Amino acid sequence: MKLGKWSVLLLVGCTAAIDIPRKPFPPTGSGHKRLTFNETVVKPVIAPSSTAVEWISTAEDGDYVFQDSDGSLKIQSIVTNHTQTLVPADKVPDDAYSYWIHPNLSSVLWATNYTKQYRYSYFASYYIQDLQSFKLAPLASNQAGDIQYANWSPTGDAIAFVRANNVYVWTAKSTTQITTDGSADLFNGVPDWIYEEEILGDRHALWFSPDAEYLAFLRFNETGVPTFRVPYYMDNEEVAPPYPRELELRYPKVSQTNPTVEVRLLSRATGEVSSVSIKAFNATDLVIGEVAWLTETHSQVAVKAFNRVQDQQKVVTVDVLSLKTKTISERDGTDGWLDNALSITYIGQIGDSKAEYYIDISDESGWAHLWLFPVAGGRPMALTKGEWEVTAILSIDKQRQLVYYLSTQHHSTERHVYSVSWKTFTATPLVDDTVAAVWSASFSSQGGYYILSYRGPDVPYQELYAINSTKPLCTITSNAAVYDVLKQYTLPKISYFELRLPSGETLNVMQRLPVSFSPRKKYPILFTPYGGPGAQEVSKAWQSQTFKSYIASDPELEFVTWTVDNRGTGYKGRRFRGQVAKQLGRLEAQDQVWAAQQAAKLPFIDAEHIAIWGWSYGGYLTGKVIETDSGVFSLGVLTAPVSDWRFYDSMYTERYMKTLQENANGYNASAIWDVAGYKNVRGGVLIQHGTGDDNVHFQNAAALVDRLVGEGVSPDKLQVQWFTDSDHGIRYHGGSVFLYRQLAKRLYEEKHRKKSEGHQWSKRSLEF
């Protein structure tokens, strides 16, 4: 578990119940102060906290480990309300970043000397701490903050770890190097950049069998994958070096060579490593999305395989002893794409049947639902159904034959917690699902207790429950202090509604009104889309009081904001999101323009000042919106945008656009290319990008700016801001604060822009 202040928990002193009832809408505050830039962007003053715990398996259900306020590790028992110190504060390593508890509580594995790599991955040194003597022993004797991953086996008798792209297994007696071919281009047990970012969403690619007798891991070969170089001009130095350091990153772009992937199985008893041939698709096109054990021991493992463009899927089981494979499930998704849900969970036999099953999330009915799949193959059974979607599996209770899950059953912007029995197929809400809200839950190891987390729209809180009880045992996190702060401020009013397209489909909208809103005044409006495939921005979760709140609070700005989830976004069914396949940017831009046209008709909107700003895919979408030359938007801000999908990674892009050879016209149409809208947008365009962006490369902004300049876009229509060495998040050397100050300045200028303003250059075309 990662360390941090958010994990502080004292059960002994928690309150009996929530003393401030939550309402089904966001708070607006009861004071008179307006939020300032410093109170929203620099150091937010309204910031609810939450608690995460590590449930552990002990004799008593309901035990969990947490880090106390003094830094010590403690174990708390819900049943006895007893707290025991596992590691005193003075015995915790000074630079500890994360920890993992031994299954029998005899020791702790610590990650120290942390160095970030990519989105999920990092390097660290690891130490094993005995909980009797508190002595620390290095996992590897000569480690130097260079271990990529480590974790206990389920039985606690071993630790699998990865160093220099090789897999090792540690036991109390010895450490064994399992692979020896790890190199800059060969990855064992950890994903390369693209698999980490786009497929696995994690920093490891190895999995112990439930009995810890076997270890399955993936081997990635990047030979032939093109290299992209990212320069670092400052490289964390105060004085720039004469020559920039360059990160050489194997980054496959559209239609380029992808890494190949193979499955390996280690028998711990023999030390033998076997290669498993997954023949679901051609080896050069094979994408492995998931590996999951379908057994309580080590008899078989499942591999979810996709073709290169991820519109064909096969689930293949591997008999561990014979290495024979069998395809037990297939799907065709050529009407769009197939998402990698990463949710396969083995449940075994159901009732009196001898057939074994696993659970997975699939949208084969047109909506993402829970399905029971026979391990031996055959027709699956829908465990949930309806025109709504399951968004996550929270827990599986095999003893009670229940699956706990989150779904959009009440509305796509909401999340409620349910259980469903695979014996009766009956679903039961754990919360009142008629009240608009976003919930989540964390269940104890044996499923007898859970922490129920209310995430909005009102101030979040957390309570502890026993299964089958409607009364909380106590409040874990009340965030009562947030209400004390809210008494001082007046906040923008947030509301939710739907816009109905001419086609009959609806778009979810989240609206913020300025704090002193008057329907008799006219206000500028800022659209803030993301809009990417399967994404969601319009949610009834707690909305952080950050930049959007600031621009609605500052009396010199007072912007209305609309966030609109266009076609292609998530949680409204396969048809709604699949429409954008092979044509990214077209329908999304149409929807944002249409929504802005509807906003312009409102009596309180200043139709002359309608701005749009987006980041990443939202930056791309902003660029496509300006390209439409609709005349409805008067200012565009593109932050870290894609400008041409040929510049982005293959596994994300081809999932939605297919290959360049198959869809050349689609790629041409999806690029930001037409410049008329950029010449005509009344308030101009601001483009922001980090030069050290290893995800959406600075190349995107550079190529777009070259196109706009080369086609004669006037200087008063185009402003460009790069951020030296900043990655996709733009934080390096104060970049974040500068970015938002610049954005606020442009919004201020847009609000006060007069119709006739503009240098003579903007009134005539330029010739070169």
From Swiss-Prot:
Residue positions with a glycan: 38, 81, 104, 113, 221, 282, 468, 668
EC code(s) of this entry: 3.4.14.5
Coiled-coil regions listed: none
A GO BP entry: proteolysis
Enzyme class: hydrolase
Keyword presence, Glycoprotein: yes
Any Gene Ontology CC annotation: extracellular region
Residues annotated as signal peptide: 1-17
Tagged with keyword Transmembrane: no
Record's keyword terms, sorted: Aminopeptidase, Glycoprotein, Hydrolase, Protease, Secreted, Serine protease, Signal
Source organism, top-level taxon: Eukaryota
Chief location of this protein within or outside the cell: secreted
Sample GO molecular function, one term: aminopeptidase activity
Catalytic residues (UniProt): 616, 693, 728
UniProt subcellular location: Secreted
Catalytic activity, reaction form: Release of an N-terminal dipeptide, Xaa-Yaa-|-Zaa-, from a polypeptide, preferentially when Yaa is Pro, provided Zaa is neither Pro nor hydroxyproline
Pfam families: DPPIV_N, Peptidase_S9
Function, as annotated: Extracellular dipeptidyl-peptidase which removes N-terminal dipeptides sequentially from polypeptides having unsubstituted N-termini provided that the penultimate residue is proline.
PANTHER family xrefs: DIPEPTIDYL PEPTIDASE 4-RELATED, PROTEASE FAMILY S9B,C DIPEPTIDYL-PEPTIDASE IV-RELATED
Family, similarity comment: Belongs to the peptidase S9B family.
Protein name: Probable dipeptidyl peptidase 4
